Amino acid sequence: MTDQFDKTEKQYIELTSGIQRFEHFSVYTDPFLPQIFSHNFVQLHRTFPLDKLLPFFSSVPGMLQANYIHVKAAPEHAFPLLLKQNLVKQGCVVEDELFFARKLENRDLQAGHPLTAWGTEKSLADGSSIMNIYDALYIGEAAAEQKLERKYPLYKDGTVMLVVCYSDASQTIPIGCGELFINKADKTAKIEEVAILDQFQRKGYGSILMNELMAAAKLNGMETVYLVTSGMDGVNRFYEKLGFKRFRRVHTIFHYFLT
């Protein structure tokens, strides 16, 4: 990992996950949140031979100490069609993580939108609350509470900024939030965990929240901001409208075992 995005991504992941490095891959695990897949995975190095991938899978659950396989290919890896077909036949889900980035020279990025807040006790409480509510809908209440307990110290000490979006300027009802992680050395920020409650989506709140996240990054001296998303066309078009451009595609493989 040599460029600014790799460095920032590594720093962000290691806030919650420990790492074991091997010759052709690294293992990231979070013993406090083994059920959160983004905290637990095997990252292949570019030197990993793809013809060894299928036999390698049998050892992954043991490495992760989990009942699932979660493997991320190196950016340099391009899976042949036959490999993808064989993975699917074995019950694996093969998806792409897409990396988007944009520069922050835009003079229109001004922090302080009346529907957003960050850096205060109230915004910390509101952001934590809405993050917990959103996560509970998708990963369950118990996992959501454990995740918040794990990440709350990072929010409280400012290691990760929590930007909140409200339904109106009274800032009474929080409806969404997003994380901002800053890599000061490389002047690069990562936007993560962007969430707007379903009933408030497609009403402009997502753009307001994203613009505030970018403005906050710019205010903190960042020159570039990036995020990682899935291959969903609608989501990708949303980020492209905000000035982001895709610069990387990474294959991910997942297989969950019921027993």
Question: Model-found features: residue ranges?
Answer:
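Conserved active-site alpha-helix within GNAT-family acetyltransferase domains
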Residues: 78-93, 207, 231-249
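Conserved beta-strand-loop-alpha-helix junction that forms the acyl-donor binding cleft
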Residues: 72-79, 226-236, 252-259
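A conserved beta-strand-loop-helix scaffold within acyl/acetyltransferase catalytic domains
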Residues: 149-195
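Short amphipathic alpha-helix that is part of the acyltransferase structural core
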Residues: 1-9, 44, 98-99, 106-147, ...
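A short helix-loop-beta-strand connector motif used in the catalytic cores of GNAT acetyltransferases and
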Residues: 13-20, 65-67, 78-79, 95-96, ...
